[in-house]
Amino acid sequence: MAGNTFGQLFRVTTFGESHGLALGAIVDGCPPGMELTEADLQGDLDRRKPGTSRFTTQRREDDEVKILSGVFEGKTTGTSIGLLIENTDQRSKDYSDIKDLFRPGHADYTYHQKYGIRDYRGGGRSSARETAMRVAAGAIAKKYLKEHCGIEIFGYLEQLGPIKAERFDKSIIENNPFFFADPDKLDELDAYMRDLKKQGDSIGAKLKVIATGVPVGLGEPVFDRLDAEIAHAMMGINAVKGVEVGDGFAVVEQHGSEHRDPMRPDGFLSNHAGGILGGISSGQEIVVGLALKPTSSIMVPGETIDKQGNPAEMVTRGRHDPCVGIRAVPIAEAMLALVLMDHLLRHRAQNFDVVTETPKLK
């Protein structure tokens, strides 16, 4: 099965299924000499792991990561870093009654048609459980980017269903179960999600992820433009149906005189482009938005077919997220970190001695 590796110089390969024995990753290309422990990865994994609030799946996984290789005496060696997370709370019996049915809106049908065989337990490889390893690998990239380049990455939920953030308070993002940035909306979100769970339904969401301190020059035109690579990374996250950089789809209603980002000697006057011009980072904040669909794993009956093509009706039982956008925040952060780390190494490889007389703006 192809498509399990991401990146060129900083390469991440993941393996494992939702109800398998374990999940794993091999991280190639991490520079040597960086201090690294399992605790450095665990923080982001704890933010993503299931069962941390009543508004996410109640599957209980500790998601404790083990570093198997690539670290000696607390420092990276420059060799492959092996990572492993054991699965401990699989309930495969929840799926035994639907093993011959295709859950509508899921990857069941397409995986079956492509490979002729599929792991029906929790979606197998197509499950968002796989993203735990992306978060672990992304934590390595985030640590290097912050310590060596001053690049920091954070994300937050901007909209859940009809509820939109109307103000931004970064200090509360990590202090509520929604990763929401508007403190005035938390009670409304709580009530909305409680009602949604009673209905047995799900809802979509929009989140934003931002990278600060990114230097000018990252990105490889024309086919590996930085924004193209970011879109590729984000679209690879389960349930993501749309990605925008900067003002994104709002540019449709903007005039050129409004959208362009004027420059003065002391910096840019705006950032409609989201920190990327011509596929290359401009030195401003990189701003990325993601739209995630409502999960199809719901208690509302839906029409489908079985393996023989016979009509059927089904309800998806088991433990599922009523809004997958909530736990997608640390996943999106990780994917942005992987892109920036890869392009940082690629930029150094080709352009480490490039010097211009033009000042670097922010």
Swiss-Prot record:
GO cellular component: cytosol
Class of enzymatic activity (EC top level): lyase
InterPro entries in the record: Chorismate_synth (IPR000453), Chorismate_synth_AroC_sf (IPR035904), Chorismate_synthase_CS (IPR020541)
Reaction catalyzed: 5-O-(1-carboxyvinyl)-3-phosphoshikimate = chorismate + phosphate
Enzyme Commission identifier(s): 4.2.3.5
GO BP, one annotated term: chorismate biosynthetic process
CC cofactor note: Reduced FMN (FMNH(2)).
Subunit structure and binding partners: Homotetramer.
Purpose: This reaction introduces a second double bond into the aromatic ring system.
Protein name (record): Chorismate synthase
Organism per entry: Tolumonas auensis (strain DSM 9187 / NBRC 110442 / TA 4)
Lineage: Bacteria, Pseudomonadati, Pseudomonadota, Gammaproteobacteria, Aeromonadales
Gene name tied to this protein: aroC
